[in-house]
Amino acid sequence: MPELPEVETTLKGVSPYLKGFIIEKIVVRNPKLRWEVSKELSTFKHVKILNLTRRAKYLIIHTEQGYIIGHLGMSGSVRIVPHDNPVNKHDHFDIVMNNGKLLRYNDARRFGAWLWTNNLSEFHLFFKLGPEPLSETFNSTYLFKKSRQKSTALKTFLMDNSVVVGVGNIYANEILFLCGLHPQKIAKTLTKKQTEQLVFTIKQVLNEAIEQGGTTLKDFLQPDGRPGYFAQKLLVYGNKDKPCPRCGTKIKSIIIGQRNSFFCPQCQKK
């Protein structure tokens, strides 16, 4: 699943081809995604794009006619291609621009979304989202206070979007390994020092992943078709039974919250 660094990479990749240009039309080939594509998007004709931003894993396109909100789902991706680029299977959605380019959304599983709102502050999917992990709001004081209320596994806690957005499964595994924390550790048992280390490492790992263009494991590619290169630096994720890069102990895998969790039983003692 594309996580925060992949969405940030997508944002940076598509912005030069969209910001300041005019949407000629929006083509919806299959409206039945995770949520049905907003009908308002089919009315977009000659609408200027003012800006592009991101909230959690949502891509937000600011226009003269409200906000287009995209989510890549489990396997979705967007590309910038010429108007005459052949349509492939699973190409469900195009934003056709006046510069000879279009943004094309491809999603085999159709777990993504393309929605519209005229008021971001009242957009229902944003109501319960926690702070951005790379913002100043997300700091050790905040995380320590938040953890006091949680009896859940630490990995589940970090992946809770009401706590902090954008720390998905891949990066949660890597962050906990770098901090030497077991993924099943109870969140409210974190010390202040451990919380400080967690916040520092979350910011470090996500920033590095963004610089590397995200992580390509199966479906994610950058908007220009290149893979993300952070996968080459993964220390534990997907490395079950391989030697720990620190101590040589075999990496173990367990299921936490229906997701595979990878850890070193020596470096990350419970």
From Swiss-Prot:
Record's keyword annotation contains Lipid metabolism: no
Cofactor note: Binds 1 zinc ion per subunit.
An example molecular function term from Gene Ontology annotations: damaged DNA binding
Enzyme Commission code: 3.2.2.23, 4.2.99.18
Catalytic reaction equation(s): Hydrolysis of DNA containing ring-opened 7-methylguanine residues, releasing 2,6-diamino-4-hydroxy-5-(N-methyl)formamidopyrimidine; 2'-deoxyribonucleotide-(2'-deoxyribose 5'-phosphate)-2'-deoxyribonucleotide-DNA = a 3'-end 2'-deoxyribonucleotide-(2,3-dehydro-2,3-deoxyribose 5'-phosphate)-DNA + a 5'-end 5'-phospho-2'-deoxyribonucleoside-DNA + H(+)
One of the GO BP terms on file: base-excision repair
Keywords per UniProt: DNA damage, DNA repair, DNA-binding, Glycosidase, Hydrolase, Lyase, Metal-binding, Multifunctional enzyme, Zinc, Zinc-finger
Keyword Transmembrane helix part of the UniProt annotation: no
Positions that bind DNA: 90, 109, 150
InterPro entries: DNA_glyclase/AP_lyase_DNA-bd (IPR015886), DNA_glyclase_Znf_dom_DNA_BS (IPR015887), Formamido-pyr_DNA_Glyclase (IPR020629), FPG_cat (IPR012319), MutM-like_N-ter (IPR035937), Ribosomal_uS13-like_H2TH (IPR010979), Znf_DNA_glyclase/AP_lyase (IPR000214), Znf_FPG/IleRS (IPR010663)
Function of the molecule: Involved in base excision repair of DNA damaged by oxidation or by mutagenic agents. Acts as a DNA glycosylase that recognizes and removes damaged bases. Has a preference for oxidized purines, such as 7,8-dihydro-8-oxoguanine (8-oxoG). Has AP (apurinic/apyrimidinic) lyase activity and introduces nicks in the DNA strand. Cleaves the DNA backbone by beta-delta elimination to generate a single-strand break at the site of the removed base with both 3'- and 5'-phosphates.
Family statement drawn from the similarity comment of this UniProt entry: Belongs to the FPG family.
Assembly description: Monomer.
Name of protein: Formamidopyrimidine-DNA glycosylase
